[in-house]
A protein has these predicted regions:
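Aromatic- and glycine-enriched beta-alpha-beta binding-site module
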Residues: 72-132
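Short histidine-centered catalytic/ligand-binding loop motif
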Residues: 29-36, 116, 126-131, 191, ...
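Compact, glycine/acidic-enriched structural inserts
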Residues: 106-167
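Long, solvent-exposed, polar/charged low-complexity segments
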Residues: 1-15, 19, 44, 51, ...
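Active-site acidic/histidine clusters and adjacent loop/turn architecture
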Residues: 14-67
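Short amphipathic alpha-helical segments
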Residues: 36-39, 43, 123, 137, ...
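A short, surface-exposed loop/turn module that caps and links secondary-structure elements
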Residues: 53-80, 84, 149-162
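Short, hydrophobic/aromatic alpha-helical segments in well-folded domains
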Residues: 11-12, 28-31, 113, 127, ...
Length: 221
């Protein structure tokens, strides 16, 4: 059962960031297993079980990241990650082109939200078309997003705007990809079992956006 992360969790993540080499990792591997990997897996499973039990119609699976970087893609970086995460997502190789619910822990804090990280241009074209033809649908979601204070909107924008819709759609229209995220510094919640409930509640808040973008993606499958 998830009991919270600990100061040792963050100490390890800081350590691996500044000592990203095999000898340091091997000397601190038990700390990683006990204070990072184990609680992250526990959190992932409990969030997944609670959320998927409420939404059995969603074809979700849970995946927890490994600390080892792909040796083919180091690009001058060390072999270990200092940011670790889990995700609730669809199965298949094309998962990054669909919305993903996620949680991430890093040395200075943690974050959670929903993103489409490798959105297909055709998906975002359907998104713009949907806003053009049915502005009330996304408009309702955009207004609800403006009224809340848990998440903020991020995502790469086109250098040349695709259009200039009126608020509140203007913040969404010209995105290449999307991330709705809550980012937090280290706080008591991170070290508490209550983190499970917070992440589940956050995913519930994001569910209308998850369903909306899942529908957009499925139209092209």
């Amino acid at each position: 059962m998830f009991q919270g992360f600990s100061q040792q969790t963050n100490d390890f993540l800081w350590g691996i960031r500044f000592n990203n080499e095999r000898s340091w990792f091997e000397a601190h591997k038990q700390t990683y297993l006990d204070q990072v990997q184990a609680p992250l897996r526990e959190l992932a499973q409990e969030v997944y079980q609670q959320f998927s039990a409420r939404h059995q119609d969603l074809p979700l699976m849970v995946r927890v990241s490994r600390i080892y970087r792909d040796a083919r893609r180091l690009f001058g970086r060390g072999p270990y990650k200092s940011h670790l995460w889990f995700s609730l997502r669809i199965a298949g190789e094309d998962w990054a082109a669909h919305p993903v619910l996620w949680f991430e822990i890093f040395p200075a804090g943690y974050a959670y939200g929903m993103g489409i990280y490798d959105a297909k241009p055709a998906t975002m074209a359907r998104f713009r078309q949907d806003m053009d033809q049915h502005p009330q649908k996304m408009g309702k979601l955009a207004r609800a997003f403006q009224k809340q204070d848990r998440f903020h909107l991020e995502g790469e924008e086109y250098k040349r705007p695709k259009g200039h819709p009126k608020p509140p759609l203007d913040q969404w229209y010209n995105r290449k990809n999307l991330d709705l995220l809550c980012q937090r510094e280290i706080d008591p919640l991170l070290y508490s079992p209550d983190l499970v409930g917070e992440v589940v509640e956050a995913f519930e808040q994001l569910l209308p956006y998850y369903r909306y973008f899942s529908d957009l993606c499925s139209r092209g499958d």
